């Protein structure tokens, strides 16, 4: 691969010789009479730590003073903010007071805050470079960031300034915030976890970079048409003021081709990957501000571009108009969409291509930055920690090994020692079928050199296993990175384990399960110390302060009068003093009701259905998947509907009204998940128009669920559903968000539900269903023994089969999966317990005083689930990095940040 850099020369200019006062390879020209300042040849990563000190000293004092004098400092009051907004309206957007609408006002306000952030971003990069400290690089295929403007306002502490300033200019801040499209860089919990981690890394002042892909159309925008999910492009990049194109940071990424072995002039055997296709990776940077700190870290996203350019003029002139742009269109598909449909072979190739494109560009960037330090390669893992968020970036292990042996000339063992001390791997699944695998023929065609390296890694690993366990031949096949199937497959999770120094799960149950099930053999090979647990967390800045500002203010008033609890969430335990305070509980209830009114208005606006804010709001919003069991939820709703229909009017008056709210996307190729969405909407169409039922039950599906919608939905929850089959959900984080906002949980003993129960107490959560240790026996009984359906579930299926909710054939596969095909996710086994527990929820909700006590107690005990705690654990036990606090580490006066 090669990087393109920007330099220019002009005839007649004096030749510039390397400066003796600033002995830097990338500097050109002496300092002195006739020279204004050293000229820096643009590189990927700016100056190294030693270089930045030398170059600062080489700049004449008057020039340094001029740069310091005129350096931007960012607005701090309403007047300066208004000045910045008006300036951007008139000079950046070419508008005026007379044609500045809300979209333009959003753009100008965003640009004003962006300018402020980028000033701190520059200083942060200078500070981190000057300190020459170890960095963490977080590789995630998803970063579900949500809206940036509101987050920036709150993190820099100037939302009230912006609110007043926008009001002076004739705008409501709420209207301006709502103009922003969510950044479509993720789908579910994986991406939101990565976003929370970026927030915490910046807020805790850790030197950190995120690396991802800049998806042109996101995963997709979900529309519901006639009850069905329809995927359309998400044009979120139409205006995005939060990114900085780095057109001078371009990396050539190679695909296909062949491997040539040869001997160099010294007779040393060499390997060269040659031929094939080149695609350019172009960098886009997004500033990530910390809360109540000057630290502003970086998220670097890669966009794909044709190496030959966007347009072939020769083909166009010859009349071949389609081919003239074909190369660019083919290249752009790599970063067009998150998770391309992989039901087809071309989709599989595109996914693997996407993953390599991203990790290769990121590794090139990381290695270039390290080489600036002029350190020995043996110090690489002392300066660089790379965390793999799931198996998607696992190719980074192979790519770093390739760089070290093929390009840097290291011996295999030395290179592998560096690689295996650099990476950490976070596993996010306990489902064997969810562990990523790629076919060997696909690898051979797309990445021939990497397949060779994988085979070599596997051979050396298996040889070490055989030496350690000489009489266990079966163990070799069980731990082999190459699965001996037809075709052979590369097991990416196994590669990640072998190439990482630490492997962590994301909840106590999950970490225990992976050690006793899917990775049991690796615990035997490597020992238990390689495996650890870091329970997931969420950032309270977005999920409490931003999503639920009134509750945040109320909590602040009871925890010392400041927002300190947002940086130390354990301060929430002060709230337990007020569980019997009537005035406090009254204000708490008023805030919850106001949030429910806000959600009810959103439901009315988006679906046309009117719901009663006084009803119990029962919410399940997350990625649609059979293991998350939205199907059990909607079957429970149908059971409730049938029960209401069978009641007399007098009996119905005793019922607590309920609104069942669903949201989430199904993968485009996941037909069963799409069927669940169709059933939810079909049930809603019947129930919401049944006059016998009225307000006693409403069924709502909110389309295109995303972070900004979650900020409306989660604070309004009374009960939220986290009902995955026990042992299938690694952690989950939406459960934490709901509880932090004063909602209770109905859930199984799975993922983080267990640890939430440990923290808040069994009396404050509604648990049901079988335990993880029972699951395999139940599945065996389904397939080889008796499988009797719960009578209530049978009645639900009968109603579906009678076309109560539309054509029964549309839902035949969903019902058949339970009745005839083994009920893999144990809906039938847990359905009775689920309904009984829902009845307990109904009863508990009637006693509002006791319900509020449960809610307040739960929030008070949620301090453990901050992503700040999570990141500190990673930093200490896996990454071995230290925070770099502004003002405590010295710094540079330079105004050119390291890129």
Which stretches of residues belong to each language-model region?
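A conserved ligand/cofactor-binding region detector
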Residues: 2-899
């Amino acid at each position: 691969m090669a990087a393109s850099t920007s330099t220019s020369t002009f005839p007649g200019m004096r030749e510039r010789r390397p400066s003796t006062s600033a002995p830097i390879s990338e500097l050109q020209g002496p300092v002195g009479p006739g020279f204004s300042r050293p000229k820096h040849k643009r590189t990927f990563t700016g100056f190294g730590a030693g270089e930045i000190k030398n170059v600062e000293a080489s700049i004449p004092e008057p020039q340094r003073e001029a740069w310091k004098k005129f350096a931007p400092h960012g607005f701090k009051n309403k007047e300066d903010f208004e000045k910045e907004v008006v300036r951007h309206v008139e000079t950046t957007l070419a508008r005026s007071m007379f044609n500045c609408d809300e979209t333009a006002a959003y753009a100008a306000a965003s640009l004003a805050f962006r300018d402020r952030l980028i000033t701190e971003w520059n200083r942060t990069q200078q500070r981190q470079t000057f300190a020459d400290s170890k960095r963490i690089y977080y590789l995630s295929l998803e970063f579900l960031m949500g809206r940036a403007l509101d987050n920036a306002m709150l993190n820099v502490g100037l939302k009230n300034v912006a609110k007043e300033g926008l009001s002076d200019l004739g705008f409501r801040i709420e209207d301006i915030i709502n103009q922003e499209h969510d950044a479509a860089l993720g789908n579910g919990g994986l991406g939101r976890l990565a976003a929370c981690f970026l927030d915490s890394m910046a807020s805790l002042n850790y030197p950190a970079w995120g690396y991802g892909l800049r998806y042109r159309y996101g995963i997709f925008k979900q529309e519901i048409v006639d009850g069905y999910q329809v995927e359309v492009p998400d044009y979120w990049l139409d205006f995005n003021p939060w990114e900085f194109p780095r057109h001078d940071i371009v990396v050539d990424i190679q695909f296909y081709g062949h491997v040539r072995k040869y001997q160099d002039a010294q007779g040393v055997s060499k390997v060269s990957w040659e031929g094939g296709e080149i695609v350019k990776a172009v960098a886009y940077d997004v500033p990530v501000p910390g809360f109540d700190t000057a630290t502003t870290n970086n998220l670097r996203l890669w966009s794909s571009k044709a190496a030959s350019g966007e347009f072939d003029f020769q083909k166009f002139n010859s009349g071949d108009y389609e081919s003239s742009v074909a190369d660019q269109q083919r290249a752009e598909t790599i970063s067009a969409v998150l998770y391309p449909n992989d039901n087809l072979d071309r989709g599989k190739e595109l996914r693997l291509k996407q993953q390599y494109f991203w990790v290769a560009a990121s590794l090139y960037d990381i290695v270039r930055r390290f080489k600036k330090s002029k350190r020995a390669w043996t110090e690489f893992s002392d300066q660089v920690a790379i965390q793999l968020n799931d198996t998607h970036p696992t190719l980074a292990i192979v790519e770093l090994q390739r760089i070290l042996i093929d390009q840097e000339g290291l011996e295999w063992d030395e290179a592998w020692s560096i690689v295996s001390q650099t990476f950490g791997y976070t596993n996010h699944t306990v489902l064997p079928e969810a562990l990523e695998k790629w076919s060997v023929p696909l690898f051979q065609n797309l990445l021939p050199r990497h397949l060779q390296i994988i085979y070599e890694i596997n051979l050396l690993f298996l040889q070490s296993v055989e030496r350690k366990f000489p009489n266990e031949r079966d163990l070799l096949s069980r731990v082999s990175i190459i699965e001996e199937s037809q075709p052979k497959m590369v097991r990416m999770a196994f590669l990640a384990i072998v190439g990482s120094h630490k492997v962590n799960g994301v909840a106590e149950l999950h970490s225990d399960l992976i050690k006793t099930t899917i990775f049991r053999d690796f615990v035997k090979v490597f020992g238990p110390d390689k495996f650890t647990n870091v329970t997931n967390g969420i950032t309270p800045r977005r999920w409490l302060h931003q999503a639920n500002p009134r509750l945040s203010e109320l909590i602040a008033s009871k925890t010392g009068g400041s927002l300190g609890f947002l940086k130390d969430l354990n301060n929430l335990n002060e709230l337990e003093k007020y569980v019997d305070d009537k005035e406090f509980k009254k204000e708490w209830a008023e805030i919850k009701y106001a949030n429910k009114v806000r959600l009810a208005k959103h439901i009315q606006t988006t679906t046309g259905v009117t719901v009663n804010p006084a009803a119990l709001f029962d919410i399940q919003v997350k990625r649609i998947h059979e293991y998350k069991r939205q199907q059990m939820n909607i079957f429970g709703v149908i059971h409730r509907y049938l029960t209401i229909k069978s009641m007399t009017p007098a009996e119905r008056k005793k019922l607590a009204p309920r609104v069942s709210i669903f949201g989430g996307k199904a993968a485009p190729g996941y037909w069963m998940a799409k069927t669940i969405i169709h059933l939810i909407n079909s049930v809603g169409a019947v129930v919401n128009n049944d006059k016998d039922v009225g307000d006693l039950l409403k069924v709502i599906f909110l389309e295109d669920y995303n972070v900004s919608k979650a900020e409306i939905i989660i604070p309004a929850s009374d009960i939220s559903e986290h009902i995955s089959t026990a042992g299938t959900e690694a952690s989950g984080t939406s459960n934490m968000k709901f509880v932090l906002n004063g909602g209770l949980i109905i859930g199984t003993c799975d993922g983080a539900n267990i640890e939430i129960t440990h923290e808040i107490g069994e009396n404050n959560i509604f648990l049901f269903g079988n335990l993880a240790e029972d699951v395999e026996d139940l599945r065996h009984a389904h397939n080889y023994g008796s499988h009797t359906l719960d009578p209530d579930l049978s009645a639900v299926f009968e109603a579906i089969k009678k076309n109560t909710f539309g054509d029964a054939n549309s839902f035949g596969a969903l019902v058949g999966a339970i009745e005839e095909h083994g009920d893999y996710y144990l809906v039938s086994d847990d359905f009775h317990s689920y309904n009984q527990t829902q009845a307990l929820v109904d009863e508990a909700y009637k006693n509002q005083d006791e319900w509020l006590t449960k809610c307040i107690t739960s929030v008070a005990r949620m301090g453990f689930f901050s992503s700040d705690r999570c990141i500190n654990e990673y930093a200490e036990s896996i990454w071995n990095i230290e925070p770099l606090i502004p003002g405590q580490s010295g710094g540079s006066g330079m105004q050119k940040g390291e890129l």
